[in-house]
A protein has these predicted regions:
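Surface-exposed loop/turn elements that mediate protein-protein interactions on large endomembrane-trafficking
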Residues: 11-26, 60-68
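Serine-hydrolase catalytic core recognition
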Residues: 33-183
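Alpha-helix-centered segments that form part of catalytic cores
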Residues: 5
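Residues that act as N-cap/strand-start positions at coil-to-secondary-structure junctions
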Residues: 8, 29, 82-84
Length: 183
């Protein structure tokens, strides 16, 4: 489940034979993935991650009341300046509410000025809690490389209007950039 307001993630339990609301088992400001359950057991394994937290493997009871982290991948990044991710919102030039993600350098100081890179392609705010491996890409930038070198990276959602890709992009992107400059 993906709450629209926070972009957090969770697992829920539901009985389709009743009209009762699903019961939350685990939810929060992270991304849960890869849940597996073996036959004849009351345990699952799954991964939990965020932009700052490596997608470690967890072992839990079916009700998620007892959970153990099995791996500690975050140890490999302890010697690096690791940035943070923040969800932001603004209004486009054509009046639509938009969201995006701002990736800030480690030890971000709001009183200080930083260079900013704008990286965009359609809608990516849903990736707020995705862990990104620091590696070169051929079609996007390495957020960690730029964060560790003192850059802010802004990834705004773009809502395209059919037949008007350039104007749509401008209408979405420019107010988002102006909002960040004004902060």
């Amino acid at each position: 489940a993906l709450p629209i307001l926070t972009k957090g993630n969770g697992y829920y339990k539901a009985r389709f034979s009743t009209a009762a609301s699903p019961k939350e088992l685990i939810a929060g400001n992270y991304m849960l993935r890869s849940i597996y359950k073996a036959k004849n057991t009351d345990h699952v394994i799954y991964t939990m991650e965020s932009f700052e937290q490596y997608p470690d493997l967890h072992y839990a009871t079916l009700d998620f009341k007892k959970s153990i982290r099995l791996t500690h991948g975050i140890d490999q990044q302890k010697d690096y300046l690791w940035g943070t991710a923040e969800l932001v919102s603004w209004i486009s030039l054509d009046g639509r509410k938009l969201e995006g993600v701002v990736y800030k350098p480690a030890n971000f100081d709001p009183a200080k000025k930083y260079p900013m890179i704008v990286s965009f392609y359609e809608r990516n705010s849903e990736t707020l809690f995705n862990y990104r491996m620091p590696e070169p890409h051929r079609s996007t930038i390495d957020y960690h490389f730029y964060n560790s070198n003192g850059y802010i990276v802004f990834n705004p959602d773009i809502r395209y209007v059919d037949g008007y890709p350039g104007e749509s992009c401008y209408n979405c992107l420019m107010p988002g950039v102006a909002m960040l400059i004004g902060k």
